[in-house]
Amino acid sequence: MVWRLVLLALWVWPSTQAGHQDKDTTFDLFSISNINRKTIGAKQFRGPDPGVPAYRFVRFDYIPPVNADDLSKITKIMRQKEGFFLTAQLKQDGKSRGTLLALEGPGLSQRQFEIVSNGPADTLDLTYWIDGTRHVVSLEDVGLADSQWKNVTVQVAGETYSLHVGCDLIDSFALDEPFYEHLQAEKSRMYVAKGSARESHFRGLLQNVHLVFENSVEDILSKKGCQQGQGAEINAISENTETLRLGPHVTTEYVGPSSERRPEVCERSCEELGNMVQELSGLHVLVNQLSENLKRVSNDNQFLWELIGGPPKTRNMSACWQDGRFFAENETWVVDSCTTCTCKKFKTICHQITCPPATCASPSFVEGECCPSCLHSVDGEEGWSPWAEWTQCSVTCGSGTQQRGRSCDVTSNTCLGPSIQTRACSLSKCDTRIRQDGGWSHWSPWSSCSVTCGVGNITRIRLCNSPVPQMGGKNCKGSGRETKACQGAPCPIDGRWSPWSPWSACTVTCAGGIRERTRVCNSPEPQYGGKACVGDVQERQMCNKRSCPVDGCLSNPCFPGAQCSSFPDGSWSCGSCPVGFLGNGTHCEDLDECALVPDICFSTSKVPRCVNTQPGFHCLPCPPRYRGNQPVGVGLEAAKTEKQVCEPENPCKDKTHNCHKHAECIYLGHFSDPMYKCECQTGYAGDGLICGEDSDLDGWPNLNLVCATNATYHCIKDNCPHLPNSGQEDFDKDGIGDACDDDDDNDGVTDEKDNCQLLFNPRQADYDKDEVGDRCDNCPYVHNPAQIDTDNNGEGDACSVDIDGDDVFNERDNCPYVYNTDQRDTDGDGVGDHCDNCPLVHNPDQTDVDNDLVGDQCDNNEDIDDDGHQNNQDNCPYISNANQADHDRDGQGDACDPDDDNDGVPDDRDNCRLVFNPDQEDLDGDGRGDICKDDFDNDNIPDIDDVCPENNAISETDFRNFQMVPLDPKGTTQIDPNWVIRHQGKELVQTANSDPGIAVGFDEFGSVDFSGTFYVNTDRDDDYAGFVFGYQSSSRFYVVMWKQVTQTYWEDQPTRAYGYSGVSLKVVNSTTGTGEHLRNALWHTGNTPGQVRTLWHDPRNIGWKDYTAYRWHLTHRPKTGYIRVLVHEGKQVMADSGPIYDQTYAGGRLGLFVFSQEMVYFSDLKYECRDI
C-alpha cells in the first residue's frame, strides 16, 4: 500500500509542475475584476441564472480591470493552450455596438485585441494588432443585438475563430495569425464591456462571463445541456491519423498507410507558407523546452527511486510508465484491440494494426479482434466467376470503401462464400479550408517618376492576396493602384519675344522724323538653360515726311483746354470750352454748379454746403450724426447725377450701440446726444449698459451692479427683492424696504398696529381717534383719517383755514381746493373759473355724471374727431389731438397750427418747431436749432429723460394727482377703492375689496406706450384688476382686466355675467353710464349690447397667481387703431394679444382699474408719448 502511494506521489508531482491546476483553467471575469454591486457605474439585475448577478454598466470609466496577477496567468495559458474560450450570457440592446472583452496597453490608447458585437452590421468582430498592423475578422449574421438573452460560446483555437449561440454553430473563420502568441500582460489592462471609444461600450446586461481553457468546445456545450451529435468521431483514430495523442512523455512511431498521389499545385499563398514556417519555428522552440523539462523530471524521478529503493524488478534496468503501470524494457502489451505498444529505452512506442480487405460482403467483427473476418468454408470458391474490378472509392476525399463482385451458376454449384468484397480506400486529404474574405497585400514601393523634368506621376500597386478570397469570401474593397504627382528638375524654357510696343510719337510733325518701337524677351524669359530670343530689341522708321505748313495754333489763341484746329491757309478755330466752363472757346468763364443745381449737396439749414471751384465743385462732409457720400465733380451733368445723400445715424439699427445683451436699444433721433438710450428688458434691471436679474419686476436688481460712474439709479440692490417697490422707500434706513419691513420706524410697534408707520411713536397717542397717531397727524385734534393736504404745507385740509394756500380763506375762496388768487368767476355761480367745470355756464352744483371733467350743464358730448374733447372745447375740432398741446397758447392746437411756436417760420421749415427762434440759429448745421438742442419742447427736461419730448405739459410719469371714478356708485354692498400713492406717483396700491373703480390720471395722450408691474399681495379673493387707456369719460374708455378664476357674478340683475379667468381687452361705450348695467357688463367675458364689447380674451384662460409679479406693456396708436397688450411673468411672455385694430377712441387718459380685489400693487408705472 505504501509503495502505491509513493508511485502516486511520483506521478502527481511532475504533472503539477508542468502547468496550471484545474482551478486555474476557468476564470470568472467579474470576480477577478472585482466587479460587484458596490462597483460605481455597475447596476445589478436578475438574469437567466438566478444564483448569479447580472450587470448593466452605465459609467464605463469606473469599470475596474482584471487583476494583474490573474492577467499574467491568462496570457501565459493562452500561449500554452494556443487559444481560449469566452462564454457569457448576454442581453444586448437592440442595434447597439458593444465590446465584450478587450486587452489594452502597454500604452494609454493602445489595444492588443478586442471582441466586439457589432449590432448595426450584425457581426461579431475579433480585432487584434500585431506589430502595429490592425487585423479584423468578422463572423456574420450572429443575431446578438436584439434585446434578447443569448448564451454564447466564442472559440479562439489555433487558427480558428468561431461562435456558438446556444447549441448552434453560427459561423467560423480562419485567423491570419495566432495573435495570442504576441499578447503582453505587463503594463496592460483587460476589461469587460469597456470599448476603445464611447460608442463601443457594451449596452445591455452581462452574466457569467468566463474565460475557459483545457476543455473542448464539445465539453463546454455538453455542460450547457447540448446533445453531442458527433462525439464518437471527435476522438476516433482513423487510417489517416499520423500520430496518437498520448501522455506528455509517450511517443509514437505509427504512420498511417500512404497512397500514391499525383503532384498537386500548391494552393497556399506565400504569406500563408511564411506564417507556417514561423509557426514551425515556434513549435521547434516549444518542443525543445518540453524535452528539457522532461529530462529534468526523469532525472528527478530516478533520484527519488534510488532514494526510496525502487521496485526490485525495475531497479537498474530500463522501464516505462503507462496508464499507472510499469513495463519492462522490450515488453509488449495491447492497449485496445487495434493498438499494441512496446517499451524501448524508457519510451512507449505504439503501433496500429492495418487490416487486409474483407473477402465477403458482410464481414463479422469478433470481440477482442481488430480486423473483420468472413465466416465461410474453404471449399466455397467452387462455382464462382473471377472477381470484377474494384468500384470507385465511396468518397472524393479522405477515407472510404470500395467493392467488387462475382457471379455463380447456382444450377450446377453450391457457390459458398460472398458475392461481394469490401475494402477500405483513402484518397487525398479533404479540403478543410473555411470561407475567408480577401485582404490587401502591402503597397509596392513607388515607381520612378514618369518624366525626367517638370511634373509627372509615380505609381504603386497592391494585390488582393493577403489572403486570397476563398469559399465565397468577399473581395478586397478599394483600389489596387495609387498615383500621385512627382516633381522633377525644371525643364529648360526657351525665351520668346513680347509683342512690339506701339510706335512712339514722331519726333517732328512735318519734314521727316523718326519713330521707334521696342520689344522684350519675356514671354517667357529664358529659364533653366533655355535659349535666348533671336532678333533686335528695337526697331526704327521714318515718319511725317510731308512738308511743314503754316500753323495758326502755334500762338495758342484758344482757352487752355479748348482744342485748336489750324488750316493750310494759316487760319485757325477753337473748340468748345472745357467741362466746367462757359464761353466761345477763346474766352471761357467758370460754371457755378452750386448756383445752377442748388440741391447738389445735402442741407439741413441755410448754411451752404456746396463749394464751387474752378473748374468743378465739391460738397462738405455730411453734418454731425449723419453719414453719406461727399461728391466731387466738374460740369453741369455731374452736378445733376452725383448728388450728396446723407442719412441720419442710428446706432440701434447699425448695431453700434453699447447696450447690455439683456437690454433694448431705444433710438431717440439723430438730433439727440446721445442718439439712443438703453433700457433693460423685462425681468432685468440696471442702467442699460449693465443689467442684472429683477425677480419682482420693479426695476431694481436682485444684486448690486457695477454701473458707470455716478449711475446709481436702478443699479443698487433691491431692498425688497420679492415684493415690488419701485420707490425703494426705507424710512428707518435698515436696508429693508418699507414695503416688506414689519416695523418701518423701528418703534417696536408692527406696521399693522402702528398709527404712525413712518414716525417713531411707541406710545401710539391718538387724540382725535382717527387711527392716525398725533405725531404724524396733520390735524391731530380734528378727525381726518384720509390726511388730505391739498397745498402740501403739512397742515391737513380738515383743519386748514386756507386749503389751497392762495391766501384766500376757505369761506371766501371760490376755489378752495385750487390755487386762484384772482378769484375770477365769469358765470357768477360762486365757483371760480379755475375749478368750474362750466366756467361760462351758471352751475353752482357742478354735477358731472359721466366724469369727463365737463359739467352736465355744458356737456353736449359732440366730438366729431373722437379725441375726448367736445367740439366747442376742442382746439382742433376736426383733427384728433387728445393731448390738446398748444405750445404758443394761441388757442389753436399744434395738430392744426402751421406755426406751433408762432416765430414766423412754418413748422415744415422750422428747426425748433415748438420753441420761438426766428433766427433759426444752427451752428453745427445738423438741422436742429441751437435753442432746442437736446430739449425739443424746452421744458428743461433733457429729451433722453423726457417721457414726452414734444409736449412740455408732460415730462415724467406721475399719478399723484388722479380722479377717482366709481363705476357703480350707488348702493352700500361694498366700499369704494382705497388708493395709496408711493414713489412720487409711479406706484399705487389699492388696499380695499371694493366696487369697480378707476384711478385715472390727468395727463392726456394720443399715441402712447404704457407699462407697469402688477402684483397681488394676498391670497384672499380672486377677482379683477387691470388698467384703462383712452379714457374720455366713465362711459367711454378701453380697459385691460385680468381675472384669477372663472366665476359668475353674484348679482344676476340686470344681466347675468360670466367672468372667465385670463386677460381681456374690452372697449366700453356705455349708453347708461356708471351703475349696475355697466358693472355686470364689465364682469362679463364677452359682449353686452349698449355697454361693453370684448376685443380679445386670452384663449389659454391663464389667471393671475397670488404673490407673483407680472409686467404689462400696452402699445396704442389711435391713427391706425393698432392695439397690442403683452404680459410677462418674469422673463417669459405669458400672454400676447397680437395686433388688435379698433378706432373707437382717438386717445385719452390713462388709469388703473380694480373690481372686487384688494391688495393690488401697481409698481414701476411708466408712460411715454409716441409721435406717430
From Swiss-Prot:
<dbReference type="InterPro" id="IPR024731">
    <property type="entry name" value="EGF_dom"/>
</dbReference>
<dbReference type="InterPro" id="IPR028974">
    <property type="entry name" value="TSP_type-3_rpt"/>
</dbReference>
<dbReference type="InterPro" id="IPR013320">
    <property type="entry name" value="ConA-like_dom_sf"/>
</dbReference>
<feature type="disulfide bond">
    <location>
        <begin position="652"/>
        <end position="665"/>
    </location>
</feature>
<feature type="disulfide bond">
    <location>
        <begin position="397"/>
        <end position="430"/>
    </location>
</feature>
<feature type="repeat" description="TSP type-3 6">
    <location>
        <begin position="847"/>
        <end position="884"/>
    </location>
</feature>
<feature type="region of interest" description="Heparin-binding">
    <location>
        <begin position="19"/>
        <end position="232"/>
    </location>
</feature>
<dbReference type="Pfam" id="PF02412">
    <property type="entry name" value="TSP_3"/>
</dbReference>
<dbReference type="GO" id="GO:0008201">
    <property type="term" value="F:heparin binding"/>
</dbReference>
<dbReference type="Pfam" id="PF12947">
    <property type="entry name" value="EGF_3"/>
</dbReference>
<feature type="repeat" description="TSP type-3 2">
    <location>
        <begin position="729"/>
        <end position="764"/>
    </location>
</feature>
<feature type="repeat" description="TSP type-3 5">
    <location>
        <begin position="824"/>
        <end position="846"/>
    </location>
</feature>
<feature type="disulfide bond">
    <location>
        <begin position="521"/>
        <end position="533"/>
    </location>
</feature>
<feature type="repeat" description="TSP type-3 3">
    <location>
        <begin position="765"/>
        <end position="787"/>
    </location>
</feature>
<comment type="similarity">
    <text>Belongs to the thrombospondin family.</text>
</comment>
<keyword id="KW-0248">Ehlers-Danlos syndrome</keyword>
<keyword id="KW-0225">Disease variant</keyword>
<feature type="domain" description="EGF-like 2">
    <location>
        <begin position="648"/>
        <end position="692"/>
    </location>
</feature>
<dbReference type="GO" id="GO:0031091">
    <property type="term" value="C:platelet alpha granule"/>
</dbReference>
<dbReference type="InterPro" id="IPR036383">
    <property type="entry name" value="TSP1_rpt_sf"/>
</dbReference>
<feature type="disulfide bond">
    <location>
        <begin position="680"/>
        <end position="691"/>
    </location>
</feature>
<feature type="compositionally biased region" description="Polar residues">
    <location>
        <begin position="870"/>
        <end position="884"/>
    </location>
</feature>
<dbReference type="Pfam" id="PF00090">
    <property type="entry name" value="TSP_1"/>
</dbReference>
<feature type="domain" description="TSP C-terminal">
    <location>
        <begin position="960"/>
        <end position="1172"/>
    </location>
</feature>
<dbReference type="GO" id="GO:0005576">
    <property type="term" value="C:extracellular region"/>
</dbReference>
<feature type="disulfide bond">
    <location>
        <begin position="594"/>
        <end position="610"/>
    </location>
</feature>
<protein>
    <recommendedName>
        <fullName>Thrombospondin-2</fullName>
    </recommendedName>
</protein>
<feature type="disulfide bond">
    <location>
        <begin position="756"/>
        <end position="776"/>
    </location>
</feature>
<feature type="glycosylation site" description="N-linked (GlcNAc...) asparagine">
    <location>
        <position position="584"/>
    </location>
</feature>
<feature type="repeat" description="TSP type-3 1">
    <location>
        <begin position="693"/>
        <end position="728"/>
    </location>
</feature>
<feature type="disulfide bond">
    <location>
        <begin position="779"/>
        <end position="799"/>
    </location>
</feature>
<feature type="disulfide bond">
    <location>
        <begin position="659"/>
        <end position="678"/>
    </location>
</feature>
<feature type="glycosylation site" description="N-linked (GlcNAc...) asparagine">
    <location>
        <position position="1069"/>
    </location>
</feature>
<feature type="region of interest" description="Disordered">
    <location>
        <begin position="843"/>
        <end position="931"/>
    </location>
</feature>
<feature type="disulfide bond">
    <location>
        <begin position="553"/>
        <end position="564"/>
    </location>
</feature>
<comment type="function">
    <text>Adhesive glycoprotein that mediates cell-to-cell and cell-to-matrix interactions. Ligand for CD36 mediating antiangiogenic properties.</text>
</comment>
<feature type="disulfide bond">
    <location>
        <begin position="408"/>
        <end position="415"/>
    </location>
</feature>
<dbReference type="InterPro" id="IPR003367">
    <property type="entry name" value="Thrombospondin_3-like_rpt"/>
</dbReference>
<feature type="domain" description="TSP type-1 1">
    <location>
        <begin position="381"/>
        <end position="431"/>
    </location>
</feature>
<feature type="disulfide bond">
    <location>
        <begin position="815"/>
        <end position="835"/>
    </location>
</feature>
<feature type="glycosylation site" description="N-linked (GlcNAc...) asparagine">
    <location>
        <position position="330"/>
    </location>
</feature>
<feature type="repeat" description="TSP type-3 8">
    <location>
        <begin position="921"/>
        <end position="956"/>
    </location>
</feature>
